């Protein structure tokens, strides 16, 4: 098989993905006798497109799945998408808006038909993009959170929880989006620091002045909400106000009086130490209100206007217009004492950017206390393990302080709550209308208008996708799953809820391990966001993108169009030529190399370029092997003699060590260490050293030596292709198809081959020592050549002082790799000349050439300083009692050996310097 001269990923990627999917390689093996390995894909929003966070996590999941597939496990990577209630409804409403239509005019049924139509037309965008990354999910099992099977599971769970007394309806404070007019979760609220004001307002005493004071001065950042105040609170130990507790003040701009109460929630040092209490529109105030049995007074309509509970002159005003009027009226009545600039965190909806309003509304809730105890026990007992383990603390902290979950949303798109009402307002929770009529004995029922929080159906994902509530073979085989790969930002919203729901309904944990990844940031450590203009599209890194198109993508759809100019300027500076095509393998290798256990991951485009070069290196090495081995004897006939050289034995031994390191890294979720080991072995050991040594051996007149060299070349290469396949699947498949026959391997795909396992018996310590010496001598020669500024074309004789037997067999390799005309070991030692001398252990090396004495003296002094520094480092360690006591004995002995070696080297360098003098 002839490979193209250069690596072009595009054709390879398109070809092989189609082959894999068509052949059914992504599906489970369906063999009960083998170990099951299952990963549930965190379902991306059906509205979404692939972003860097997806691409990063999908790469890691795919690497794990491919690795375990090659280990022979019965693997399932369950894909699917989330209906994403709010996000999807917004997308479709915006389309309708462009057509001059409104969903309320259309009606619920027609609107939902339109959403389903959009989902069928556009909902598969992200899964097509996932295929471009090489993700080997079992697409035949793809699920959608609102498909028939999953919807049935959602209804089953809701009805059971209600009948167990865990779901109830109640009026509580929620995050309310006045634009969407729905409750939203904390995850959909983004708190942004903004410049605001702190208004100091006089609340006059009810009857008379106290100690000459007219009233209490209250500090607030939201003067409009004072229309809903029901108390003023002070700290019970605050001596300034303790005597006023139990008295009343008049609420400015209103006819009401409100009490002065004592509560330790108040910070005496903030503002004036007096806090207005508005339980209907502040989460902290709501808790204060509960403690003091205050009746909340809601003053906002659901669209953020002032309602009829406020004085008539404010009714109907938008909340921000009401703020202006409140301030103006307070000034007119001389009740506004002071206004100060004040920075504060403003909660905004992540979809609408509107200020989120705490709002008292009727909602459905799930009682969490009992479920949380199960969730905590699962981690404490080790049934679920977090990697890194510190994230278990975050999980536990949330469950230990959990509140009941508001599970209803005021949307049309989503799982409609299976609750019906009769004409008297009685609620009937049932599986369907027919059962509701049966239970109520009434025909005229209407269903609850609300839908469930998207996270409710997502919490059932690990078992609903396997066919629950039916007891399917898949449920029996793949629950618990093996690992969940996700981000730390949804430990509360998703991970914990999956654990609780799975335990409650199946008695099993949803997964045994949770691998928490870091957050992908830009090269400067900034979070990638549209507003910052630093977002990268993974497909642009795979296919490349022109500068004009990159600017268009970054400046379209900005919430603040004024940012477009600065974003364009920054983009032109960073990517003057656009972004070149790196291919999926280079991007995947970049992600793997960055996947440490840190919280933040800086994505540097230069890494992509470096790993594209790595792919080229692997490609070119394979071309060399094919050119020298195809059509020739590669040692397949075991009856023919094989004469393995120390170089062959060394690379085979190094391969065993690399295999051990990579397996350990995969098992510990250290993708960065796996990638580094692969990179260093392939580039440094195999390509830069072994291939160069093999070139010499292929010119040997010993046929058994040539045969052994060709066998080693192809078998080591075939093995590293299998080893690297989970991370770089496309190039390894293409190259394996060409190399495998030469290594005696058969099979339709590298995906179906066994993963390389180390054999410690194949490590030859003597060969390793011999090649290490050879490498050091070659490097010393190259250093001498560089310092003497010799042209690569100049072939110079090398003179050596030392043990002839240790190097005699490597003269041809030395000549080739160090570009020498000849090599000679002098029994009487090196000549007493001004020529520079390099020291390698017990060997002294000299290139036979006239030298610049001054330059050589500088070189020796520089080398002496370096060696003295190494001696100092070694002595510091060996003089440290903690190091001697705590370090492994092997490490201590290594350090002692280093000290002896460097001391010997220093002595020889001093001798050389004296000779120059």
From Swiss-Prot:
Its EC number is 6.1.1.9. One of its GO terms (cellular component) is cytosol. ATP binds at residue 530. It is an enzyme of class 6 (ligase). Keywords: Aminoacyl-tRNA synthetase, ATP-binding, Coiled coil, Cytoplasm, Ligase, Nucleotide-binding, Protein biosynthesis. CDD domains: Anticodon_Ia_Val, ValRS_core. A motif ('HIGH' region) lies at residues 44-54. It is found in: Cytoplasm. The keyword Cell membrane does not apply. GO terms for molecular function: aminoacyl-tRNA deacylase activity; ATP binding; valine-tRNA ligase activity. GO terms for biological process: valyl-tRNA aminoacylation. Catalyzes the attachment of valine to tRNA(Val). As ValRS can inadvertently accommodate and process structurally similar amino acids such as threonine, to avoid such errors, it has a 'posttransfer' editing activity that hydrolyzes mischarged Thr-tRNA(Val) in a tRNA-dependent manner. Monomer. This is Valine--tRNA ligase. It comes from Nitrosomonas eutropha (strain DSM 101675 / C91 / Nm57). The gene is valS.
């Amino acid at each position: 098989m002839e490979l193209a001269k250069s690596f072009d990923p595009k054709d390879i990627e398109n070809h092989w993905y189609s082959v894999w999917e068509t052949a059914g390689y992504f599906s489970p093996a369906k063999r009960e006798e083998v170990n099951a390995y299952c990963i549930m894909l965190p379902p991306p929003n059906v509205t979404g497109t692939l972003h860097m966070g997806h691409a990063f996590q999908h790469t890691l999941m795919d690497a794990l799945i491919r690795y375990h597939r090659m280990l022979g496990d019965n693997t399932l990577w369950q894909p699917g998408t989330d209906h994403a209630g709010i996000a999807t409804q917004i997308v479709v409403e915006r389309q309708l808006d462009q057509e001059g239509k409104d969903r309320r005019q259309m009606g619920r049924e027609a609107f939902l038909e339109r959403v389903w139509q959009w989902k069928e037309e556009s909902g598969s965008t992200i899964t097509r993009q996932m295929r471009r990354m090489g993700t080997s999910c079992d697409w035949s099992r793809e699920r959608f959170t609102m498909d028939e099977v999953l919807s049935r599971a959602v209804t089953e769970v809701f009805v059971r929880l209600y009948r167990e007394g865990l779901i109830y309806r109640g009026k509580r404070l929620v995050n309310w989006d006045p634009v969407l007019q729905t409750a939203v979760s904390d995850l959909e609220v983004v708190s942004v620091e903004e410049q605001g004001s702190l208004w100091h307002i006089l609340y006059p005493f009810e009857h008379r002045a106290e100690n000459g004071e007219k009233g209490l001065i209250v500090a607030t950042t939201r003067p409009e909400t004072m229309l809903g105040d029901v108390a003023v609170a002070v700290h019970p130990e605050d001596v300034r106000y303790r005597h006023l507790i139990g008295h009343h003040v008049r609420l400015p701009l209103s006819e009401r009086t409100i009490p002065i109460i004592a509560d330790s929630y108040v910070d005496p040092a903030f503002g004036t130490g007096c806090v207005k209490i508005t339980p209907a529109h502040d989460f902290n105030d709501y808790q204060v209100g509960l403690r003091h049995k205050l009746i909340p007074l809601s003053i906002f309509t659901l669209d953020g206007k002032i309602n009829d509970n406020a004085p008539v002159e404010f009714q109907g005003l938008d909340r921000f217009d009401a703020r202006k009027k409140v301030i103006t009226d307070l000034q007119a009545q001389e009740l506004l004492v002071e206004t100060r600039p004040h920075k504060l965190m403003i909660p905004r909806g992540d979809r609408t950017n509107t200020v989120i309003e705490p709002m008292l509304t009727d909602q459905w809730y799930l009682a969490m206390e009992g479920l949380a105890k199960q969730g905590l026990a699962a981690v404490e007992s080790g049934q679920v393990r977090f990697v890194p383990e510190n994230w278990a603390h975050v999980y536990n902290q949330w469950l230990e302080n959990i509140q009941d979950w508001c599970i209803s949303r005021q949307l049309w798109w989503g799982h409609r709550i299976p609750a019906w009402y009769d004409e008297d307002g009685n609620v009937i929770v049932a599986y369907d209308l027919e059962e509701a009529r049966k239970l109520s004995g009434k025909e005229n029922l209407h269903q609850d208008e609300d839908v469930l929080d998207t996270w409710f159906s997502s919490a059932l994902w690990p078992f609903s996708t396997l066919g629950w509530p039916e007891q399917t073979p898949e449920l029996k085989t793949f629950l618990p799953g093996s690992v969940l790969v996700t981000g730390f930002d949804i430990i509360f919203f998703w991970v914990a809820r999956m654990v609780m729901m799975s335990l409650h309904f199946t008695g099993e944990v949803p997964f045994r391990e949770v691998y928490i990844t870091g957050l992908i940031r830009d090269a400067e450590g900034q979070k990638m966001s549209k507003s910052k203009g630093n977002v990268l599209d993974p497909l642009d890194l795979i296919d490349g993108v022109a500068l004009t198109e990159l600017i268009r993508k970054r400046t379209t759809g900005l919430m603040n169009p004024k940012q477009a100019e600065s974003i364009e300027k920054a983009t032109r500076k960073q990517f003057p030529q656009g972004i070149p095509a790196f291919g999926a393998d280079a991007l995947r290798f970049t992600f793997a190399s960055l996947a440490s256990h840190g919280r933040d991951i800086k994505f540097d485009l230069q890494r992509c370029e470096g790993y594209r070069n790595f792919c080229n290196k692997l490609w070119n090495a394979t071309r060399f092997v094919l050119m020298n081995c195809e059509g020739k004897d590669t040692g397949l006939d075991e009856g023919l003699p094989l004469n393995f050289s120390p170089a062959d034995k060394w690379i085979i031994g190094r391969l065993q060590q690399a295999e051990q390191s990579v397996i350990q890294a995969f098992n510990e979720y250290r993708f960065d260490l796996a990638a580094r080991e692969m990179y260093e072995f392939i580039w440094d050991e195999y390509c830069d050293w072994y291939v160069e040594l093999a070139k010499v051996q292929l010119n040997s007149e010993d046929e058994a030596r040539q045969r052994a060299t060709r066998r080693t070349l192809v078998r080591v290469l075939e093995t590293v292709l299998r080893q690297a396949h989970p991370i770089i699947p496309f190039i390894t498949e293409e190259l394996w198809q060409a190399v495998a026959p030469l290594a005696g391997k058969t099979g339709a795909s590298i995906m179906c081959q066994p993963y390389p396992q180390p054999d410690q018996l194949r490590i030859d310590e003597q060969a390793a020592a011999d090649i290490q010496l050879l490498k050091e001598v070659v490097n010393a020669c190259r250093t001498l050549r560089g310092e003497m500024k010799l042209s690569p074309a100049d072939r110079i004789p090398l003179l050596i002082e030392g043990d002839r037997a240790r190097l005699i067999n490597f003269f041809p390799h030395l000549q080739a790799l160090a570009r020498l005309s000849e090599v000679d070991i002098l029994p009487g030692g090196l000549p007493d000349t001004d020529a520079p001398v390099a020291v390698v252990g017990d060997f002294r090396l000299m290139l036979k050439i006239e030298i610049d004495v001054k330059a050589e003296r500088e070189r020796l002094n520089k080398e002496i300083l370096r060696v003295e520094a190494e001696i100092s480092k070694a002595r510091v360690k060996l003089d440290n009692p903690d190091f001697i006591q705590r370090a492994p004995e092997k490490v201590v002995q290594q350090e002692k050996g280093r000290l002896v070696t460097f001391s010997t080297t220093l002595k020889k360098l001093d001798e050389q310097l004296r000779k120059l003098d």
